Amino acid sequence: MNECLIKNWNSVVGKEDHIWFLGDFSFGKYEETAEILAQLKGVKHLIVGNHDRKGRAEKLFNRDWENWFVDKHDYYRLKIGEYKFVLCHFPFSSWERGYVNLHGHLHSLAGYKNKWRQYDVGADANNYTPLLMEDAWNRAINGEKSVDFY
């Protein structure tokens, strides 16, 4: 499974591309997760998820995060040209006007309906492949539902 995830990732992410992890990256052991991170292309930014603050993930994502990521946030506003995003692990019920809320956390929860201008970018909700920001924007604006695996 890990090989497939790495292949999917590297098929769309280039070495210089900026990529945002929106939390809950791994439940694996430190060494295993570090080995995976080392194989993933891109300039990595971390938005911390609820499972990144405890257990095995705590060391990797709270103490040693600078080995893998250029920065770490709980919440981040990002502007790319005309696209404006609020990034958080958790979906919001309300956010800044004109922005799209990209989130994870739900793990493609059955029956969850994103609000307009909101999209679950979690790997398990998107065929285990990262999305281009433009695609995430369009899916949020068009009210597309994430994949339902449950």
Which role fits each region the language model picked out?
Residues 1-74:
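Core catalytic region of metal-dependent phosphoesterases/phosphodiesterases
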